[in-house]
């Protein structure tokens, strides 16, 4: 081991964003001092000096103790999308699920977060929702689409659960949405 870095939480996936493999985006979980997991965390690390790596920036999705967030990108690297926009700058596209444990369901979200990332910081550019409302529960067959994103001609196409959404990269406006049909036999439904 060349070096270590003490930070709260941990990254389960690291992605290099420069040619020297010294600037890394990390996706993982934030944790408190006791090690209890608090939710999704995106970090930017500088490993120019391997003996003394640094966390340059980090953001967490949670805004309060009654909120939980997660991303399939923490365990499925194909769910992670990096769009290079120049030297050490780009867009990070992640599938994100946010759940509020309160009666107010307005904090719930199921879709994708798009972050602007550079050495100067990490900022949320837009969110792309894959649900009609804050209600996650619905009747679908158990065949779900893997959480993926692609960029074509200035549009982000996101795939998650039972829908595909195309969103303009610059304006954030939804171009179209395709929903998988619900099964005719409602007895075979799975609810989540």
Language-model region placement:
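Feature marking well-ordered beta-strand scaffolds used for ligand recognition
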Residues: 1-192
